[in-house]
Amino acid sequence: MIPLRSKVTTVGRNAAGARALWRATGTKENEFGKPIVAIVNSYTQFVPGHVHLKNVGDIVADAVRKAGGVPKEFNTIAVDDGIAMGHGGMLYSLPSREIIADSVEYMVNAHTADAMVCISNCDKITPGMLNAAMRLNIPVVFVSGGPMEAGKAVVVDGVAHAPTDLITAISASASDAVDDAGLAAVEASACPTCGSCSGMFTANSMNCLTEALGLSLPGNGSTLATHAARRALFEKAGETVVELCRRYYGEEDESVLPRGIATKKAFENAMALDMAMGGSTNTILHILAAAQEGEVDFDLADIDELSKNVPCLSKVAPNSDYHMEDVHRAGGIPALLGELNRGGLLNKDVHSVHSNDLEGWLDDWDIRSGKTTEVATELFHAAPGGIRTTEAFSTENRWDELDTDAAKGCIRDVEHAYTADGGLVVLRGNISPDGAVIKSAGIEEELWNFTGPARVVESQEEAVSVILTKTIQAGEVLVVRYEGPSGGPGMQEMLHPTAFLKGSGLGKKCALITDGRFSGGSSGLSIGHVSPEAAHGGVIGLIENGDIVSIDVHNRKLEVQVSNEELQRRRDAMNASEKPWQPVNRNRVVTKALRAYAKMATSADKGAVRQVD
């Protein structure tokens, strides 16, 4: 039997002072000696993905208490990338992942919690909590706040608009074809409910990946934030974590710990899912970071290999008019995993917080397995309510029928895949010897080969300026550098540049490469995570206006057509300059907090985690 971590503060004469303080928090006499479960919430009124979580912690806590645990709740910070987008606030987004991970570690270790339920949702919160879970390696269950419903709009000329989302609104703001009244209609409908933004953007991608990693319950990634069916997920999470405590502390079963569940094979399955669902490029960054925190031997080379063999089975906004509610109707993540499993593309010897084997897990939850439980079938009938609300569990609408069309539906089988390669591709070449990433699911295959002259800028702000002033021309490659983890610092998302290119009619006529990153809502020929970054001496820092840049997605190449000798001459000149590997004439306030992150941040190929050894 393994002693509870909390025993040091709850048992024995030496713990009298700590017990006195526990009593002051409401702990009862009969609760001492039971596992203390940290309810790691992330409620905030700043973020639609978290605005409905205030009372959710109580639901989880009640379930923990009924199952025999002692729940204690605390909150982490949560940054809304959409609100932070396009100004200095975005510098703080990625570093907030590390702050979240640190704060969870600090609270859990300082108070000797025995286990966690992580109530996450948006872009950096799930990854931050995941990093903490992999560090701490104590029993954990993830349960997110759920996706937002897609918006519905009718533009002023009476033409029905496709389902809308945040990206629709941003792109429309840069389009001359959309007047102010039309823009207002899109804006008013783009984000109609609480929840994480409704497409396969970063937040939803990561919440789906926790299912594949085995750390969350089926339906976690796709059940809408507004649907009453989501309440059962929170209740089950609280019940499950206490069972995991029993198995670990009572039976010494280390297989139920995060590192026992999220093994290398589980990481491979998660990235296979990511390729199949065309997830956000940010998922690569966050999965690499989680692997590093958990000391899992999984790196960019493994992801590259997976992308060569795993087909793209689903295209969801921003790459189509499908949204997360449509993914859910098609069976959610279990249906995608089921198709991959039938295609022989998953490791079978993995388990999860809710199942001891993959086959049983998918038999029960994949609506196409032929063995689906009634509970699973009922869950995936959960449909959007279609009304504006910030309230969780506010609708009980049901789909009349599920989407099981494996040929043309939201989730396809391997035979009817969109592409044979995965939806995410790693590119290498003299610009990115350590790798760069493109969301191939977001571009038509005829654009997979692109060559054009470079238009070099040294900040996101300058990139936006050259687009909106129509300085950039069709056929050019916009190079945005010094926006990496150290160079930014903070590796800003380039959502505004990509959305404005699209809104300006250049989304299929220009390419963009950067050592920064992209929002999960970005689409088009957008290549990010260029490593090494400019601030670390990467070749992207040596590109000059007019240099010919070639992109070959089929052959996974990213090159600048400049000789090695000329690149070395430029490198020597850069090293001899007064301020080498720094942006020229960039006016940006970088605080001490950001400088601290910049000093320790690795490039994107290492997940942009901090290197402190």
Curated annotation (Swiss-Prot):
Gene3D superfamilies from the UniProt entry: IlvD/EDD C-terminal domain-like
UniProt-annotated binding residues for Mg(2+): D81, D123, K124, E493
InterPro entries in the record: Dihydro-acid_dehy_C, DihydroxyA_deHydtase, DiOHA_6PGluconate_deHydtase_CS, ILV_EDD_C, ILV_EDD_N, IlvD/EDD_N
Annotated cofactor note: Binds 1 [2Fe-2S] cluster per subunit. This cluster acts as a Lewis acid cofactor.
The reaction(s) this protein catalyses: (2R)-2,3-dihydroxy-3-methylbutanoate = 3-methyl-2-oxobutanoate + H2O; (2R,3R)-2,3-dihydroxy-3-methylpentanoate = (S)-3-methyl-2-oxopentanoate + H2O
Source organism superkingdom: Bacteria
tRNA-binding as UniProt keyword: no
Required cofactor(s): [2Fe-2S] cluster; Mg(2+)
Active-site residue list: S519
Sorted UniProt keywords: 2Fe-2S, Amino-acid biosynthesis, Branched-chain amino acid biosynthesis, Iron, Iron-sulfur, Lyase, Magnesium, Metal-binding
Top enzyme category: lyase
Subunit comment: Homodimer.
PANTHER family (alphabetical): D-XYLONATE DEHYDRATASE, D-XYLONATE DEHYDRATASE YAGF-RELATED
Family per record: Belongs to the IlvD/Edd family.
Name used for this protein in its record: Dihydroxy-acid dehydratase
